[in-house]
Regions:
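N-terminal leader/capping segments at the start of a protein or of a new domain
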Residues: 1-34
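Conserved beta-strand and immediately adjacent loop positions that scaffold enzyme active sites
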Residues: 66, 75, 162
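Active-site beta-strand termini and strand-to-loop segments that position acidic
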Residues: 69-72, 144-146
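Unchanged
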Residues: 92-181
Length: 191
């Protein structure tokens, strides 16, 4: 964000505000990788677009799409993978649109059909390391609906241990306590 925007910004708990002039992008990335940083970081700079391009250049970009799917009972489709609650999502195939990928991934990961794609809810970014490469994953999140009444079937070869329908109350009481911050943000926008 620019200095003018930063002057009006109130940082939430665990968010650190840094100046681009005080640390290089590489130093910032090393700090994030070491785990010795705040939960969130806001970078103040004169040219946010240029800073973003420099940040993205440090990673291999991966693009994914997923959905917040509601059934006819207004329950939300969730998955449990690698010890966390999550939403179904996955990488785009070559020449596939984010919306088409979201529908395909939900169907593959949960065995649910009759999906209707709704509007784009949110776009998130998160980083991880895979085979010693730094990955920046951009995920498009869509609102979706289904009339499929079948019980979800988890895609075990994707390490999905469970796929189930939760009420909004269950999402707030169970899901939110054990999920990723970016996924929680997506669901909060959808509820």
């Amino acid at each position: 964000m620019t200095p003018v925007e930063a002057a009006k910004f109130t940082a939430g708990p665990g968010t650190e505000i840094i100046s681009e002039s005080s640390v290089s992008m590489e130093q910032l990335l090393e700090g994030l990788s070491s785990g010795n940083t705040a939960q969130g970081i806001v970078c103040v700079c004169d040219d946010p677009d240029n800073a973003w391009r420099r940040w993205v250049s440090l990673f291999t970009l991966s693009v994914a799409a997923g959905g917040v799917v509601r059934n006819v009972d207004n329950r939300i489709l969730v998955i449990f993978r690698r010890g966390k609650w999550d939403l179904p999502k996955g990488k785009l195939d070559a020449d596939e649109s984010p919306g088409d990928a979201a529908v395909r991934e939900v169907s593959e990961e949960c065995g649910i059909g009759e999906l209707q794609l709704g509007p784009l809810l949110h776009t998130t970014f998160h980083t991880y390391t895979e085979k010693k490469k730094r990955i920046l994953k951009k995920t498009y999140w869509y609102s979706m609906g289904t009339t499929d009444v079948r019980k979800p079937v988890p895609q075990e070869d994707e390490d999905i241990e469970a796929a189930e329908w939760m009420t909004e109350e269950q999402v707030r009481s169970e899901f939110f306590g054990n999920t990723y911050r970016s996924v929680r943000e997506v669901l909060e926008k959808a509820l």
